[in-house]
Amino acid sequence: PLFCDASGDGVVGFLSGAPYRMGAESREEFGEKFAPAEDYGELLGHSLYFYTKDTGKPVKYVAPSYAMDVTKTVPRFRSFNAKEHGCKLWWVEYGGDLDTVHDTEQIKWELWKVIYGAWDYIKNSGKYPEAETMTLEWVGCIPGKRESRRFEGDYMLIQQDVIEQRHHEDAVS
């Protein structure tokens, strides 16, 4: 019989004892050129979106006490743009070195710290006068997962399948 586990983290497959993997395999295992030279246990992190709105009038912002000081913790290769929101802030990510199945709540709180801290910086640093009339309209509360368990089956989809657009009769990996 065929079954599709669409629970999100493969809960049904995991509880049934199905073999799975987490993290990236080495380049050598499947001959994937873009894979890392050696396997590692880190995963892609979780993301939370947030949206801003221009109210047309000045709006003050007071960050919650748990907001992160992003001037000390966000890598310097990133910059902030007061007009960016939602999908343009995809890089607001955290949790790749944690257990993305079981630590989602902890990851969510860290993401909130970053988001509220980033908005505090945008609103109150004085570097973004265009943000004076903007408000933080909405902040997500369920992190978007980018990676979790990958179950092993009769066939495992590899990089070449995607790049070469290989056809598979069952269209399932």
Locations of regions flagged by a protein language model:
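Flavin (FAD/FMN)-binding glycine-rich loop and adjacent Rossmann-like elements that form
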Residues: 1-2, 6-173
